[in-house]
């Protein structure tokens, strides 16, 4: 029996002779439809089409292979029914020649067949990505050298504006950014020149009609509509009476003012600007609270009016921070710089093209551009027309079918237009995709191509037609209802670029059937009533402000951090998975298995954890879930270069190339290949403190130190040197891939790692390095030195390669993957984690923004005055880019939701649940009845914000509404079911490993069970054993390891307790006691801020450790350094915002800061964040220990010294403090940390071998240095 197609699917399969757009929602069977359409075209009708007369374009090579395989299977099945069919046999024979391919592969085929038309050597190859990056870097270096030699003033201004203080790296990055961006379009040089000319503007009147001005106006009208809506709601509340009538004196004219602004905007940007500059909000009339019936209504009306006021003030003070005249002048001023920059980009592009031609290589951008060059000609007037090759393709292809059309970009669209008959008679393009799943903006995917056709194509007979497949055959009704509710409430033309309404909603197409004896595995037939399926969509929120173990903020040491919320969220997920696998009520959770046609018990492999990005999350999740005994796998794409086996081999390669590298030589010597010990390293270093280890090893082998070292160590050194010399000799002539395999064999290291834990994985990693070397050998670079550069570049450009994949798809493990990697897949149970993570908008902070339609958005930079500010054009482009970023995030969320077949669980964390619920309710209350208005959606900072905003309007959202005090109109008609649970930290602080069962030992006092003297004797013996006391019991409380912070705290607590006893003894007045003892339990403290004082201190220390000491003079330099840390994801965006750059500048301007900088600039040693481990007597920690018994006991002390630096006459120790300190209480503050600083001094004295001359605390709060006196 064949597949039963829906009416819409039948139309998509059989409609011919038109351009056809199939909008296929998630789970609608679009691939099956596409394959069936092809099969019918090549096997049915009076004139079946040969399969090589079709061009089928897919998004990935894997998709192309799957498509070819499915078509082949379908033809083979048809042949089984009709073995004599010559037509079918012909199609099977032609299948290998069929153009079922990615766009890049099609372009490559066109180039190979027509290389002579573009003067290309037929022996070309596709360059390795890293090889191409190295070529780019070489070209940039040569280009800048030539430009500096020309001594061009405009170039110097460009370097001053965008270059760094010590290098041109930033300007290099900008040139590469421009190049990569323009190459995603069909006419890169033309686009760049046209967009630069937009800066050549002379009057305000020229602004009108600019595309970016229209976008700016769209953004402004959104803000004005928001402001108007809030004011009218405030008016409605005030008009209801209850004592709020005085507010109407302000609100009525303010509503008129906003309406006038909207009218002015419709008449032009100049009129709007003039009107905006005159806009004002007076002081709100006071209302006596005693006369107010409903205080909540008062607060709501006031809040709505204030929010409206902020919107207008933001437009006036930020968007239009300069006048229109200044905006025009600013753009004019940037015109020469932009022209110079575009010239550099074009020159770079030309040189890069020439270098590739010289080496006979192409990159992926070349494939599309050279293909287009072959496919187009120009007429006498310069207009583009199809070339002869393109015309031949138009005749050849009966149909061009494009899969995943929503992810096409402009140049691919142009190529499809050249080889198809889209715009002429007999249209023949079939496009299938779902714009709601367009999530590849970073690859320059342009969803507007899909949207433009979606809007203009008709649903009935026409040359341009669309068909909508919105029946979902993947998910249960519970999932469908949940997806539809969330996205009807949130997704709009503004955020999502599509209005999600009834027409766009998913329709149920899957049939799972009731759970009964006929469709369940045999072993569960008798337990039908004890089985579970599906259930509510679950929302789990970690409240980071929940109950915490009490600790004052200033007691948290700088080396300490709160337990990471990522770990806690992983524990929530661990508990949910355990609950699914083994419910506490003894039931069983079941999923439907299509292959069995029955329900079976859930397995780990049925569960996937989806994350927006796996970096910094997946590894923690794997570790935490492991503590619950959950098998889990995460393909993070990272960690390869950090594996011990790869680090060891790379260390060997580094010293074979250049042995004068101590870090690499120590790494190699410490490895099992040579097995040097730490003590032997110390012995070698003591022989000579100034020379490289390699030089010392050579001298050892030469016999210079025979009296100072053992024969065994000399033998080890000779063994190492002999091997190193042999390897260096072979490396000079062997191809690098052969040499690496020789190393594996000669050291037996490949076999050795195979015996280690995860040995198969480790050997696979080594094979990847060998394969990488083989790829390198095919490039234009040769030799070990260049290979090491190649690997270093690979680390920087690609970040990491990820460990080798050895996991089969049927392994019974929970998988962790990014939402992007999950696209096209489906899972019975989806756990969407990390939804509280804020959206990444870092790209919007860059100096220059690029947009395909709107052009170039840059700051206005005055090099001479050293000032910069955003141009009006940049404001517009930034706003547009932000809308596109958030629209894509909305679509990514849709992709995540629609991966679930039967169960969806959502987790996320917030800093303060009560505050978050208030914000969600506020956004909901100020929106329409059943939707969150786009302005409020734009305020959301995370997926969790969006989901919870929507749920405030849902019947199951009581928990959120109750916490947030929300007075909201509910959508009572929705069928989806949701359950909500908030988690406090205290619930999650124990993992499964920490949980211990209590051993309750009952001691019977009665002797009714004692029957003999023997029994009595045994009882006495048992009691003696149980009553045994360890002789050294006092030392059991003394830790073997302790941090400096813990030691400081222990002493402070002892002092605090003594002070408390003194107070109790000496003060009879109860009030005085209360005044002096001010500690409160954590739950009585006021709610903490999003970043505690301790967390801010940790962030400050991190910045002080990593900041470039050459860039600490000016505020802008420090701010730029912090921004770099955020871009590199060393700090989160929110952490970057709390860094007080002014405080940091104050330090470096202080006497102490200047002394540190002077040491740095004069080449003396400056150390930051030095970790140490030393030993101290245990009596320092436990003062009640008897020195006669414990005097020799030592405790290992560990800590981190913030900074110390060298001066002519000795070293200076420095410790940063961010604590709150009252002016005048400096002495108490010094005493508080004196023991810590003295321990640091003692440790440094041992390390340096000389006395530290001075020690300081630096208080960021007081902005002063505090000297610690010698004791």
UniProtKB/Swiss-Prot annotation:
Residues 528-824 form the UvrD-like helicase C-terminal domain. Disulfide bonds: none annotated. GO terms for cellular component: cytosol; DNA helicase complex. It holds the Pfam family UvrD_C. ATP binds at residues 24-31. InterPro entries: AddA, DNA_helicase_UvrD-like_C, DNA_helicase_UvrD/REP, P-loop_NTPase, PDDEXK-like_dom_sf, PDDEXK_AddAB-type, Restrct_endonuc-II-like, UvrD-like_ATP-bd. Transmembrane segments: none annotated. Signal peptide: none annotated. GO terms for biological process: double-strand break repair via homologous recombination. Residues 3-476 form the UvrD-like helicase ATP-binding domain. Its cofactor is Mg(2+). Its EC number is 3.1.-.-, 5.6.2.4. The heterodimer acts as both an ATP-dependent DNA helicase and an ATP-dependent, dual-direction single-stranded exonuclease. Recognizes the chi site generating a DNA molecule suitable for the initiation of homologous recombination. The AddA nuclease domain is required for chi fragment generation; this subunit has the helicase and 3' -> 5' nuclease activities. Heterodimer of AddA and AddB/RexB. PANTHER family: ATP-DEPENDENT HELICASE_NUCLEASE SUBUNIT A (PTHR11070:SF48), UVRD / RECB / PCRA DNA HELICASE FAMILY MEMBER (PTHR11070). This is ATP-dependent helicase/nuclease subunit A. It comes from Clostridium perfringens (strain ATCC 13124 / DSM 756 / JCM 1290 / NCIMB 6125 / NCTC 8237 / Type A).
């Amino acid at each position: 029996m064949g597949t039963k197609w829906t009416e819409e699917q039948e139309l998509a399969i059989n409609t011919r002779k038109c351009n056809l757009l199939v909008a296929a929602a998630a789970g609608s069977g679009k691939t099956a439809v596409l394959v069936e359409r092809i099969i019918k075209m090549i096997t049915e009708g009076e004139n079946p089409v040969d399969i090589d007369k079709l061009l089928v374009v897919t998004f990935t090579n894997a998709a192309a292979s799957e498509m070819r395989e499915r078509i082949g299977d379908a033809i083979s099945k048809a042949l089984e029914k009709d073995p004599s069919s010559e037509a079918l046999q012909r199609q099977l024979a032609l299948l290998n020649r069929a153009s079922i391919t990615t766009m890049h592969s099609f372009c490559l085929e066109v180039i190979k067949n027509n290389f002579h038309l573009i003067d290309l050597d037929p022996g070309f190859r596709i360059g390795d990505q890293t090889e191409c990056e190295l070529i780019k870097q070489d070209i940039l270096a040569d280009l800048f050298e030539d430009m500096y030699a020309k001594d061009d003033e405009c170039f110097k201004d460009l370097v001053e504006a965008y270059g760094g203080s010590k290098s041109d790296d930033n300007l290099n990055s900008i040139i590469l950014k421009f190049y990569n961006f323009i190459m995603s379009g069909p006419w890169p040089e033309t686009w760049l020149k046209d967009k630069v000319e937009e800066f050549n503007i002379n009057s305000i009147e020229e602004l009108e009609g600019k595309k970016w001005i229209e976008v700016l106006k769209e953004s402004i009208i959104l803000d004005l509509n928001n402001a108007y809506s809030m004011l009218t709601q405030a008016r409605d509340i005030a008009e209801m009476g209850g004592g709020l009538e005085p507010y109407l004196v302000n609100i009525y004219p303010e509503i008129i003012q906003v309406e006038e602004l909207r009218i002015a905007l419709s008449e032009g940007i100049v009129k709007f600007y003039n009107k905006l500059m005159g806009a004002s909000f007076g002081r709100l009339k006071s209302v006596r609270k005693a006369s107010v019936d409903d205080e909540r209504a008062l607060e709501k009306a006031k809040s709505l009016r204030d929010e409206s006021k902020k919107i207008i003030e933001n437009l006036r003070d930020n968007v239009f921070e300069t006048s229109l005249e200044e905006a025009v002048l600013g753009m004019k001023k940037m015109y020469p710089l932009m022209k110079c920059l575009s010239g550099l980009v074009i020159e770079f592009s030309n040189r890069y093209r020439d270098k590739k031609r010289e080496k006979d290589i192409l990159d992926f951008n070349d494939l599309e551009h050279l293909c287009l060059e072959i496919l187009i000609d120009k007429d006498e007037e310069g207009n583009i027309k199809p070339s002869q090759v393109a015309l031949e393709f138009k005749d050849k292809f009966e149909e061009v079918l494009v899969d995943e059309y929503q992810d096409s970009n402009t140049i691919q669209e142009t190529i499809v237009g050249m080889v198809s008959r889209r715009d002429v008679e007999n249209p023949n393009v079939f496009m299938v995709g779902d714009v709601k799943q367009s999530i590849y903006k970073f690859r320059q995917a342009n969803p507007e191509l899909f949207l433009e056709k979606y809007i203009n194509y008709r649903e009935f007979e026409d040359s341009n037609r669309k068909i909508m497949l919105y029946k979902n055959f993947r998910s249960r009704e519970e999932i469908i209802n949940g997806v539809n509710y969330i996205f009807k409430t949130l997704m709009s033309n503004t955020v999502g670029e599509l209005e999600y309404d009834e027409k766009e909603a998913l329709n149920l197409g899957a049939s799972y059937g009731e759970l009964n004896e006929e469709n369940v595995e045999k072993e569960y037939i008798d337990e039908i009533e004890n089985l579970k399926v599906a259930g509510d969509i679950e929302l789990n929120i970690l409240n980071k402000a929940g109950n915490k173990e009490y600790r004052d903020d200033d007691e948290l040491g700088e080396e300490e951090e709160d337990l990471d919320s990522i770990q806690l969220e992983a524990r929530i997920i661990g508990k949910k998975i355990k609950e699914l696998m083994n419910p506490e009520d003894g039931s069983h959770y079941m999923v439907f298995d299509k292959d069995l046609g029955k329900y079976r018990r859930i397995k780990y492999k049925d569960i996937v954890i989806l994350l927006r990005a796996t970096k910094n999350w997946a590894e923690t999740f794997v570790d935490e879930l492991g503590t619950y005994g959950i098998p889990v796998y995460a393909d993070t794409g990272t960690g390869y270069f950090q594996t011990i086996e790869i680090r060891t081999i790379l260390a060997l390669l580094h010293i074979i190339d250049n042995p004068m590298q101590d870090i690499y030589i120590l790494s190699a010597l410490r490895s099992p290949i040579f097995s040097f010990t730490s003590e032997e390293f110390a012995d070698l270093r003591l022989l000579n403190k100034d020379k490289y280890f390699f030089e010392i090893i050579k001298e050892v082998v030469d016999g210079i130190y025979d009296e100072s070292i053992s024969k065994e160590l000399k033998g080890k050194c000779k063994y190492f040197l002999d091997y190193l010399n042999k390897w260096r000799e072979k490396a000079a002539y062997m191809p690098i891939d052969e040499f690496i395999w020789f190393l594996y064999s000669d050291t037996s290291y490949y076999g050795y790692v195979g015996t280690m834990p995860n040995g198969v994985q480790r050997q696979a990693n080594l094979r990847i390095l060998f394969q990488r070397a083989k790829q390198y050998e095919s490039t234009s670079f040769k030799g070990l030195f260049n290979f090491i550069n190649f690997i270093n570049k690979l680390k920087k450009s690609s970040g990491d390669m990820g460990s080798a994949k050895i996991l089969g798809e049927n392994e019974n493990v929970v998988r962790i993957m990014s939402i992007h990697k999950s696209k096209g897949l489906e899972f019975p149970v989806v756990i969407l984690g990390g939804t509280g993570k804020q959206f990444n908008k870092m790209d919007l902070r860059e100096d220059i923004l690029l947009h395909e339609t709107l052009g170039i958005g840059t700051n206005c930079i005055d090099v001479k005055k050293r000032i910069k500010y955003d141009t009006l054009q940049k404001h517009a482009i930034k706003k547009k880019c932000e809308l596109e970023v958030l629209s894509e995030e909305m679509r990514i969320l849709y992709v995540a939701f629609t991966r679930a077949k039967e169960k969806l669980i959502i987790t996320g964390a917030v800093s303060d649940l009560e505050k978050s619920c208030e914000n969600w309710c506020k956004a909901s209350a100020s929106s329409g009845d059943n939707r969150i208005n786009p302005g409020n959606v734009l305020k959301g900072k995370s997926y969790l914000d969006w989901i919870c905003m929507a749920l405030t309007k849902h019947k199951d959202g009581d928990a959120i509404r109750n916490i947030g005090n929300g007075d909201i109109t509910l959508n009572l008609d929705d069928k989806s079911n949701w359950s909500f649970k908030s988690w406090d930290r205290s619930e999650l602080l124990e993992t499964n490993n920490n949980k211990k069962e209590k051993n309750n030992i009952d001691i019977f006092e009665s002797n009714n069970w004692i029957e003999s003297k023997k029994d009595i004797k045994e009882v006495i013996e048992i009691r003696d054993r149980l009553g045994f006391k360890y002789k050294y019991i006092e030392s059991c409380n003394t830790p073997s390891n302790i941090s400096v912070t813990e030691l400081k705290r222990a002493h402070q607590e002892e002092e605090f307790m003594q002070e408390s006893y003194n107070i109790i003894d000496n003060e009879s007045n109860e009030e005085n006691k209360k005044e002096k003892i001010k500690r409160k339990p954590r739950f009585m403290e006021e709610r903490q801020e999003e970043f505690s004082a301790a967390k801010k201190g940790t962030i400050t220390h991190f910045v002080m450790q990593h900041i470039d000491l050459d860039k600490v003079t000016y505020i802008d330099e420090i701010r730029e350094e912090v921004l770099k840390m955020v871009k590199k994801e060393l700090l989160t965006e929110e952490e970057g915002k709390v860094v007080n750059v002014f405080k940091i500048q104050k330090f470096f301007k202080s006497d102490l800061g200047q002394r540190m900088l002077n040491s740095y600039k004069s080449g003396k040693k400056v150390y930051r964040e030095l970790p140490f481990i030393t030993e101290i007597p245990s009596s320092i920690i436990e003062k009640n220990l008897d020195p006669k018994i414990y005097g020799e006991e030592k405790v290992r002390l560990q800590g981190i010294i913030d900074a110390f630096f060298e001066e002519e006459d000795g070293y200076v120790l420095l410790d940063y403090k961010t604590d709150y300190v009252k002016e005048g209480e400096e002495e108490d503050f010094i005493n508080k940390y004196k023991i810590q600083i003295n321990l640091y001094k003692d440790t440094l004295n041992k390390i340096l071998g000389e006395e530290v001359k001075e020690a300081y605390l630096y208080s960021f709060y007081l902005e002063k240095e505090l000297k610690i006196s010698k004791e």
